[in-house]
């Protein structure tokens, strides 16, 4: 039998101590905001039929390079969920949620996702993604509300971000654009990376535009842009949206190279990127509109808009002040309970349960019966207070409570403590 230590799989994380506190604090705040914006939570399975992703994201890196696939005992091709939207819309259609609820349908999720990619700061193979989907007969005010919600999340965690925005047009406009891009980039095939060459003759050609290396090349910067192909009506629509952002006081940057990494986007796409940060993974929230995915999975001519964020990436870019605030916010006292009197073990155990029933965080450590050792244990285990039960406490129905931060203590009647 091998003695080699088994460790976590590369690209995954064990959550504990302060990291777990941060994860919970961020999650709780975002969920609370979701409630304020009247979104309802939805959970979908961790794995789906692989076709759900291969059919709707066939040209994306997610399917080509990053999808975790498996074949089960019944020879079915399955895949670990790489993103949330396709699964959500599959569930919406399967359970007829659009028929049973008023429009727009407003859903959010917070789930683990899986992508086989090189682990780096803010990007893991297993990561927790929060996202929203707004589905129905949408208009520009729905788009604006979605952007405002995303901005509200970022403001809550004191992130200074720049909104990057682009308009990809409808399916017909985008198809013409993709055809022109393919013709254009074939002229420079010898100057493209192997990955970019593999993206030619498909919708994947769009990814050349926002590739971190290719986008620095002059001929890529001079490539045809979508505004040369969208209709006058769409140009007017986008212009109105930008004017409305101005009226709302939302600063933005028009980025004609912004395409996002998923095939189903059309019309509006956007990203909130950390200001004054040139790191590759500095996008904190990304999203956009989509219609073809809705039509493909529900057979309804509707629109949807959504965005997503990674909890891990949020944590990696939080400033120290915000981290400390999140870790210490609403932190309740944690009590270590010890008994110094023989034959009072069951009575102490019963006392611990009574305190827990009154919503106190209490642990009775029955193996400690000396105060100095109990203090050392409590400090190591991050308890804030020590409850000492000696002969006087038992006879007078009191508790001696020691504050471990100030090293002060008081003796108080049990009934007064639980009021």
From Swiss-Prot:
InterPro entries: aa-tRNA-synth_II (IPR006195), aa-tRNA-synth_II/BPL/LPL (IPR045864), Anticodon-bd (IPR004154), Anticodon-bd_dom_sf (IPR036621), His-tRNA-ligase (IPR015807), HisRS-like_core (IPR041715), HisRS/HisZ (IPR004516). Gene3D superfamilies: Anticodon-binding domain, Bira Bifunctional Protein, Domain 2. Pfam families: HGTP_anticodon, tRNA-synt_His. GO terms for biological process: histidyl-tRNA aminoacylation. Keywords: Aminoacyl-tRNA synthetase, ATP-binding, Cytoplasm, Ligase, Nucleotide-binding, Protein biosynthesis. It is found in: Cytoplasm. It catalyses: tRNA(His) + L-histidine + ATP = L-histidyl-tRNA(His) + AMP + diphosphate + H(+). Coiled coil: none annotated. The keyword Hydrolase does not apply. GO terms for cellular component: cytoplasm. Its EC number is 6.1.1.21. It is an enzyme of class 6 (ligase). GO terms for molecular function: ATP binding; histidine-tRNA ligase activity. The keyword DNA damage does not apply. Belongs to the class-II aminoacyl-tRNA synthetase family. PANTHER family: HISTIDINE--TRNA LIGASE, MITOCHONDRIAL-RELATED, HISTIDYL-TRNA SYNTHETASE. Homodimer. This is Histidine--tRNA ligase. It comes from Mycoplasmoides gallisepticum (strain R(low / passage 15 / clone 2)). The gene is hisS.
């Amino acid at each position: 039998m091998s003695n080699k230590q088994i460790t976590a799989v590369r690209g995954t994380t064990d959550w504990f101590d302060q990291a777990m506190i941060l994860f919970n604090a961020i999650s709780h705040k975002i969920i609370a905001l979701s409630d304020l914006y009247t979104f309802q939570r939805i959970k979908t399975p961790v794995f789906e039929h692989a076709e759900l992703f291969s059919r709707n994201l066939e040209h994306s890196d997610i399917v080509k390079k990053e999808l975790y696939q498996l074949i089960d005992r019944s020879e079915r091709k399955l895949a670990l969920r790489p993103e949330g939207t396709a699964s959500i819309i599959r569930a919406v259609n399967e359970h007829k949620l659009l028929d049973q609820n008023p429009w727009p349908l407003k859903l959010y999720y917070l789930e683990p996702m899986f992508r086989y990619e090189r682990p780096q700061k803010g990007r893991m193979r297993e990561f927790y993604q929060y996202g929203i989907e707004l589905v129905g007969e949408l208009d520009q005010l729905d788009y604006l509300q979605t952007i405002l919600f995303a901005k509200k999340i970022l403001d809550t965690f004191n992130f200074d971000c720049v909104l990057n925005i682009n308009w990809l047009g409808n399916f017909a406009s985008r198809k013409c654009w993709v055809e022109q891009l393919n013709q254009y980039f074939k002229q420079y095939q010898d100057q493209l990376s192997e990955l970019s060459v593999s993206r030619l003759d498909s919708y994947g050609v769009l990814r050349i535009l926002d590739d971190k290396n290719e986008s620095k090349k002059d001929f890529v910067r001079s490539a045809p842009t979508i505004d040369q192909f969208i209709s006058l009506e769409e140009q007017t629509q986008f212009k109105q949206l930008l004017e409305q952002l101005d009226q709302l006081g939302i600063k933005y940057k028009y980025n004609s190279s912004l395409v996002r990494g998923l095939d189903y986007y059309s019309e509006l796409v956007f990203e909130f990127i950390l200001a004054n940060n040139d790191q590759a993974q500095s996008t904190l929230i990304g999203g956009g509109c989509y219609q073809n995915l809705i039509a493909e999975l529900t057979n309804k001519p509707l629109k949807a808009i959504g965005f997503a964020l990674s909890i891990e990436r949020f944590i990696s870019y939080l400033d120290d002040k915000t981290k400390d605030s999140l870790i210490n916010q609403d932190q309740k006292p944690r009590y270590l309970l010890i008994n110094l009197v023989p034959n009072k073990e069951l009575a102490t155990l019963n006392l611990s349960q009574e305190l827990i029933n009154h919503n106190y965080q209490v642990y009775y450590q029955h193996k400690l019966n000396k105060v100095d050792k109990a203090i050392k244990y409590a400090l190591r285990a991050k308890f804030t207070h020590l409850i000492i039960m000696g002969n006087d406490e038992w006879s007078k129905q009191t508790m001696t409570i020691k504050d471990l931060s100030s090293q002060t203590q008081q003796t108080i009647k049990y009934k007064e403590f639980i009021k």
